[in-house]
Amino acid sequence: MSNLNGVLLIDKPKEFTSFDVIAVVRRLTGQKKLGHTGTLDPNATGVLPVLLGTATKTQDLILNHDKSYTAEFQLGKITDTLDIWGTVTGECESSVTEEQLRRVIPNFTGEIEQIPPMYSAVQKNGQRLYDLARQ
């Protein structure tokens, strides 16, 4: 049994769940006490801090810090999952200009309350929304 204490910053690859990453770290290190600081959707990539040993006690401190996200988007397509991985259910020509985008971007900066889409890792009654959506 390993007795490591600290934080590993893992660049979570696409198609791995946060739990998958924890399982790999557990298998590679033999560490029993592990945690992470917030679930990333399986199709999301990015830094996933993995806490080992006594560092798991700092989880709340890390979770309560500001986070930032970078997003890419495509205008003119609608999918059944509201993301790029779904089946395209509609298309339209986009007449939005770069200037129009630059004017509205400030509306998406700062603290924003968002209703998560059904295809997300958010849990309801102990189940991931993306699992419920696929049923």
Regions found by a protein language model. Give the residues of each.
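Catalytic/RNA-binding core of pseudouridine synthases
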Residues: 1-135
